[in-house]
Amino acid sequence: MRVLVTGGSGYIGSHTCVQLLQNGHDVVILDNLCNSKRSVLPVIERLGGKHPTFVEGDIRNEALITEILHDHAIDTVIHFAGLKAVGESVAKPLEYYDNNVNGTLRLVSAMRAANVKNLIFSSSATVYGDQPKIPYVESFPTGTPQSPYGKSKLMVEQILTDLQKAQPEWSIALLRYFNPVGAHPSGDMGEDPQGIPNNLMPYIAQVAVGRRESLAVFGNDYPTEDGTGVRDYIHVMDLADGHVVAMEKLADKSGVHIYNLGAGVGSSVLDVVNAFSKACGKPINYHFAPRRDGDLPAYWADASKADRELNWRVTRTLDEMAQDTWHWQSRHPQGYSD
């Protein structure tokens, strides 16, 4: 298939592009490089074994997207592009709504004009808000996300659902993922946050290589086994595989298809710290800090629907997530070159 991947040079996008190329698909990457670096592109080509086309541009440029869809005869779109830092979204709500919501509106408007009606959307478990029961199941009503980031993901889900209802021939997959971590097993591709990492695993990795002094563990008085927050961590390679499988199985299958992509088990912050310490062979310096507003004690996915309908399930453990992250970070302590 001929696939447009928006945000394809970012963390999850780049790993997905490698899997698409390895599966024989033709890939066009659209990215404005605000959260990624151009130097990942030759890595994608080398690991994927095939050349992807790269277009530097913004998701909000509808004319550019229309041109790409026509010129490359695109069959399907995998939509990663957007801003993704929860804390930053609270400080910059307008930027988040503009990029994530308006950007998606521009994308699907261009798709409609070009008669491209297969879309895989990178959603998030944040759309569930605070649920009374765990694990989270796709049939749960969506909640009230705490941040503009989470709200933007929910808004886009609602927009795409309304679009498909009005134009039933569309096939739209809403992939709700939990906490992506890990790196390509080659050690040549991984998460390279711009500035201070917002997520746990890359922060631990930077502590391990000496870029950060200590990890702040927010809250050690939660009603969990060790008192720290529990989340569902999924290896980025399993997540990439999930996108490829969803794209291949749902092409031209009309409807809105919602799937949780997660490991289906919860791991605490200290579980992750201990796994990483084992991977790098040294203790990770950490200290406890007060809880953060809006953080939930524990949640994880019920991913049985993706197993049942897509024949997709995770194959990589928390130890492998830590090992692959350490392999990447130790080989590239400063991330990608500029």
From Swiss-Prot:
Keyword Nucleotidyltransferase: no
UniProt enzyme class: isomerase
UniProt keyword list: Carbohydrate metabolism, Galactose metabolism, Isomerase, NAD
Entry-linked SUPFAM superfamilies: NAD(P)-binding Rossmann-fold domains (SSF51735)
Catalytic activity as recorded in UniProt: UDP-alpha-D-glucose = UDP-alpha-D-galactose
Positions annotated as active site in the UniProt record: 149
Pathway stated in the Swiss-Prot or TrEMBL entry: Carbohydrate metabolism; galactose metabolism
Residues bound to substrate: 124, 149, 179, 199-200, 216-218, 231, 292-295, 299
EC number: 5.1.3.2
One GO BP annotation of this record: galactose metabolic process
Molecular function GO labels: UDP-glucose 4-epimerase activity
Binding site for NAD(+): 11-12, 31-36, 58-59, 80-84, 99, 124, 149, 153, 178
Annotated Gene3D superfamilies: NAD(P)-binding Rossmann-like Domain (3.40.50.720), UDP-galactose 4-epimerase, domain 1 (3.90.25.10)
An annotated GO cellular component: cytosol
InterPro entries (UniProt xref): NAD(P)-bd_dom, NAD(P)-bd_dom_sf, UDP_G4E
Cofactor: NAD(+)
Quaternary structure note: Homodimer.
Similarity comment: Belongs to the NAD(P)-dependent epimerase/dehydratase family.
PANTHER family in alphabetical order: UDP-GLUCOSE 4-EPIMERASE (PTHR43725:SF47)
Purpose: Involved in the metabolism of galactose. Catalyzes the conversion of UDP-galactose (UDP-Gal) to UDP-glucose (UDP-Glc) through a mechanism involving the transient reduction of NAD.
Protein name, UniProt field: UDP-glucose 4-epimerase
Species the sequence originates in: Salmonella typhi
Encoding gene per record: galE
